[in-house]
Amino acid sequence: MAHLLIHRGLAKKSFKENTLQAFKYCFTKKYGIETDLHCTKDNIIICFHDFSLKKKFKTNKLIKNLTFYEINKIAKKFDHYVPQLKELIKISKNKNYLMLELKSFFSKKNLTQLINLTKKLKFFSITSFNEKNIKNIYILKKKLNLGLVFTSTTPIERIIKKSRLKYVKILVMEKRFLSKKKLDTINKPIYYYTARNKKIKRKYSDKNLIFENL
């Protein structure tokens, strides 16, 4: 059975991405979510996509150089709140699937914190474009559902090669790969991002999709 996740909690166009309000709505509809993780200067793991606040809050400051308090002091001016991962875990009530994508490089300290935060979760995966993140967390705890994320320009041969790595349990790739039959040789779960219309959802109903707009 295909697995459907909502991209950054964007179940509706009116929602703000990676917010507790958006996540809660997805959970009421019985959908899991995909979200992005960064670490702040004071080592708080937050749900936020970009490396800086420039796009969202018109402030050209990097997440890694700001504390959690400083980030939300800026976000508040835009009527926004950037949540911590632990807040997301709490509202998921251990019933809804969480795909946690590590956007930035996570230190050993950050990864250990992540492992501790997720140790009671039943339904989740940890993914990243940065293979070092996945290798390093595998060293710390092997029995985790870990995955690599690939861009739309990644050669299929490279994807197939990476799929054979022992620490790669799932693969996440751009939706242009949905029609690529060569990937059928991979005997691991594959997720495709980001489906933004119901036509794709219907056409590929047998695939694991990360989508927006119910």
Language-model features: where?
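Phosphate-group recognition and catalysis centered on beta-loop-alpha active-site segments
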Residues: 1-214
